[in-house]
């Protein structure tokens, strides 16, 4: 199954801006890989909460649409809230 996530490039980075994003219902994320510059992105929490429950989400290549440009990525790490059903941050790698 293929998954597509619509994202926007983040201009502010850091702990404070990430907290503001989470309070607004968004998830901060980063895409990195060898030979490429890291890209900080954000997307809606509702876009990720249901698809991350599927097992193949972690093993298949995903498509992230960053302001109209599609990028193939793979999930590297997910940080979740300690007791709430919330995703706090995701690390993607370029596929």
Curated annotation (Swiss-Prot):
InterPro entries: Rbsml_bL25/Gln-tRNA_synth_N, Ribosomal_bL25/Gln-tRNA_synth, Ribosomal_bL25_long, Ribosomal_bL25_short, Ribosomal_L25_dom, Ribosomal_uL5_bac-type. It holds the Pfam family Ribosomal_L25p. The keyword rRNA-binding applies. GO terms for cellular component: cytosolic large ribosomal subunit. CDD domains: Ribosomal_L25_TL5_CTC. Keywords: Ribonucleoprotein, Ribosomal protein, RNA-binding, rRNA-binding. GO terms for molecular function: 5S rRNA binding; structural constituent of ribosome. Part of the 50S ribosomal subunit; part of the 5S rRNA/L5/L18/L25 subcomplex. Contacts the 5S rRNA. Binds to the 5S rRNA independently of L5 and L18. PANTHER family: RIBOSOMAL PROTEIN L25/GLN-TRNA SYNTHETASE, ANTI-CODON-BINDING DOMAIN-CONTAINING PROTEIN, RIBOSOMAL PROTEIN L25_GLN-TRNA SYNTHETASE, ANTI-CODON-BINDING DOMAIN-CONTAINING PROTEIN. This is Large ribosomal subunit protein bL25. It comes from Shewanella frigidimarina (strain NCIMB 400). The gene is rplY.
């Amino acid at each position: 199954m293929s998954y597509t996530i619509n994202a926007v490039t983040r201009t502010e980075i850091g702990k404070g801006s990430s907290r503001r994003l989470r309070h607004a219902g968004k998830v901060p994320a980063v895409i990195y890989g060898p030979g490429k510059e890291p890209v900080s992105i954000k997307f809606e929490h509702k876009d990720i909460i249901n698809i991350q429950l599927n097992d193949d989400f972690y093993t298949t290549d995903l498509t992230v649409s960053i302001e109209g440009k599609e990028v193939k990525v793979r999930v590297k790490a997910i940080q979740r809230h300690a007791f709430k059903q919330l995703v706090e941050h995701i690390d993607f790698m370029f596929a």
